[in-house]
């Protein structure tokens, strides 16, 4: 039954060296959360809960952010914000984002490089411009034949 503010405070303390400015940085990234900062997290909309989860991950300014299927369960508006956010994290904060994702349109909008895994093996990698439908179809057809 914690508020947004309390959630962020706990996340900040997890590193043992809380930085008060970091919370303001998170509120800059997620202005809607600032407006709701005294609201209990369990009463938030799914989109706001999603933003709070991202804010908790970012409040300690990690050098590397790992996201596994970040669009899963996200509404359209959050997906649009996520595209902008990931670009901003990399461009302005120099943060590296490692992304596991199946939606090619999203990958093409946010990634610089890709690594295609098939059954746990790296089968292709390169600049995201090299990620084409033929390459995907080749590996998807192999999976269908299994």
Describe each model-derived feature in a short phrase.
Residues 2-21, 30-31, 126, 142-143:
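ABC-type ATPase nucleotide-binding domains, specifically the catalytic core motifs of the NBD
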Residues 57-58:
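ABC ATPase C-loop
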Residues 61:
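Conserved catalytic motifs of ABC-family nucleotide-binding domains
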Residues 65-69:
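Catalytic Walker B motif of ABC-type/P-loop ATPase nucleotide-binding domains
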Residues 80-92:
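Helical segment within the ABC ATPase nucleotide-binding domain
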Residues 101-102:
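H-loop/switch region of ABC-family ATPase nucleotide-binding domains
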Residues 107-109:
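A short, surface-exposed alpha-helical micro-motif characterized by mixed small hydrophobic
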């Amino acid at each position: 039954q914690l508020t947004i503010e309390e959630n962020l405070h706990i996340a900040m303390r997890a590193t043992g060296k809380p930085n008060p400015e970091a919370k303001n940085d998170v509120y800059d990234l997620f202005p809607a959360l600032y407006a709701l900062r005294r609201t209990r997290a369990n009463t938030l909309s799914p989109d706001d809960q999603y933003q709070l989860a991202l804010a908790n991950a970012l409040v300690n300014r990690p050098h590397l952010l790992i996201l596994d299927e970040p669009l899963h369960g996200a509404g359209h508006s959050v997906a649009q914000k996520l595209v902008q956010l990931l670009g901003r994290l990399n461009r302005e904060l120099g943060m590296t984002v490692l992304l596991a994702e199946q939606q090619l349109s999203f990958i093409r909008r946010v990634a610089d490089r890709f690594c295609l895994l098939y059954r746990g093996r790296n089968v292709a990698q390169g600049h995201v411009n090299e990620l084409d439908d033929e390459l995907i179809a080749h590996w998807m057809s192999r999976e269908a034949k299994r």
